[in-house]
């Protein structure tokens, strides 16, 4: 297995697919990286030369991926919570952040139902 940005990428898959195993690199970014490195998307990872791997690593080093990207995302969320913005409040309360309805659905974000007992009338 080749290691790129601290991640073992699968040897038997095409390079364009293997690069998506790195957090922060999707299909489009992987295609751009390979075009810049001059490597065919159809090449398997096991068939890459050390020179090609080195060029790919150099390009990925310029992109924010893995730990740096995760840290930036968490700091952005923390900043929203500290300044008291609406989005920050939604993050703090564990509710949907992007305007979705939460009366009936939003179970993924809210977690399992907590049944509240009825008051006697």
Curated annotation (Swiss-Prot):
Which Gene Ontology BP annotations are present? translation
Position of the signal peptide? none
Q: Which UniProt keywords apply?
A: Ribonucleoprotein, Ribosomal protein, RNA-binding, rRNA-binding, tRNA-binding
Instruction: State where composition is biased (Basic residues).
Output: 106-121
Q: Name one GO cellular component term.
A: small ribosomal subunit
Give me the ranges of the annotated region Disordered: 91-121
Any GO MF annotation of the entry: rRNA binding
Q: Which Gene3D superfamilies has this protein been placed in?
A: 1.10.8.50, 30s ribosomal protein s13, domain 2
Q: Does the keyword rRNA-binding apply?
A: yes
Task: State one Pfam family annotation.
Answer: Ribosomal_S13
Q: Which PROSITE patterns does this entry report, sorted A to Z?
A: RIBOSOMAL_S13_1, RIBOSOMAL_S13_2
Family the UniProt entry places it in? Belongs to the universal ribosomal protein uS13 family.
The record's listing under PANTHER family reads: 30S RIBOSOMAL PROTEIN S13/40S RIBOSOMAL PROTEIN S18 (PTHR10871), SMALL RIBOSOMAL SUBUNIT PROTEIN US13M (PTHR10871:SF1)
The record's annotation in NCBIfam families points to:
uS13_bact
HAMAP family per the UniProt record, alphabetical: Ribosomal_uS13 (MF_01315)
Give the multimer and partner information.
Part of the 30S ribosomal subunit. Forms a loose heterodimer with protein S19. Forms two bridges to the 50S subunit in the 70S ribosome.
Function according to Swiss-Prot or TrEMBL:
Located at the top of the head of the 30S subunit, it contacts several helices of the 16S rRNA. In the 70S ribosome it contacts the 23S rRNA (bridge B1a) and protein L5 of the 50S subunit (bridge B1b), connecting the 2 subunits; these bridges are implicated in subunit movement. Contacts the tRNAs in the A and P-sites.
Protein name stated in the entry: Small ribosomal subunit protein uS13
Q: Which organism is it from?
A: Bacillus cytotoxicus (strain DSM 22905 / CIP 110041 / 391-98 / NVH 391-98)
Q: What is the lineage of its organism?
A: Bacteria, Bacillati, Bacillota, Bacilli, Bacillales
**Gene of origin?**
rpsM
